[in-house]
Structure formats: C-alpha cells, structure tokens
C-alpha cells in the first residue's frame, strides 16, 4: 500500500493537484466523483485515493480491460462493464458490497463525460440497496483540488437526496465546463 500511496502523492504533485478533507472511516461506500467531463477525472481520483491510502473500484467499459494495458487498468480497480448488452449493473454492484467487507466504489453521477440532461441514478440505487453511505469527491480544476466535503446516508427519497448531492458540486469547475450540467431529477 505504501508504494501505491507514494505513486498517488507523486502523481498529484507532478500535476499540481492536492487533496482536501479526511477519508471517512466507513469500510464500504459509494463515492460520487465529479464533475466528470474528461478521462483525466478518473486518473486524478485514482491518484487522490492512493494518497489517502484507499484502494477503490470503479466501473469502466469492458474494452478498457482488454489488450496490452488491460491488466494495468484492472489493477487500478476497474470493474469491466459490457455496455453492448443490458446488464443488471446495480444488482451486481449491490452483490459486490454483500460479498466484500471493504469496498469503495467510485461512480460519476453523470454516468458519462458528455453533457447530460439529468444525472444517472445508479449510484444512488447501489448505495440504497447495499445499505452504504455516499461520499462526495469533488474534482475542481480551477483550484486543482480533489476534496471530500461530506458523506450522506441516503434517505430513500431520491429527489431530496439528489438536491443535496448536487449542491456539493455546484461551485466546482470541470475540465470541460460546457459538459458539466447540474440538473434536476
């Protein structure tokens, strides 16, 4: 873990990034990481988690884990998702929480790097079904900071909780601001 920590620390320093906030004590959680408008967002999140000494998991398209770099991508925590067919991804992730005592799953709430009319609800349903909290990771390109401003135990009222979640991202500057849209449910 120490090599992982030093890798993350060095990578953040080289990029001029820093972390803010303490990692929560919870052993299982869903982490909403945003704004998500670039592949760099995932790289900075992985590096920040390494600096916090956390091994995280994240969902990525299956093709990322194939080919010569596939092993490295899986090593960083990628859970391959086959997007060519319908899968019960929410159910599979809930089952993963039931099977693993220590699981930190990072999910961009927008679900994509492109601008969206509404955020995806999968992160919320995974957390509710698994009975785990949602921690907010905010990546701000203006300040080059990955921060953890709060953790929310979902109430089951998606609309009310979504307003809380989105409030923590309102002041963040995305790498591509035109692709970051705070939307209603």
How would you describe each model-predicted region?
Residues 17-21:
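Short secondary-structure junctions
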Residues 1-2, 38-39, 63, 116-117:
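Short alpha-helix boundary/capping motifs
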Residues 16, 53-55, 75-77, 102, ...:
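A generic structural signal for alpha->beta connector loops
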Residues 3, 7, 11-14, 24, ...:
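Non-catalytic C-terminal accessory region of glycerolipid acyltransferases
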Residues 22-85, 141, 150:
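Catalytic core of membrane glycerolipid acyltransferases/transacylases, capturing the structured
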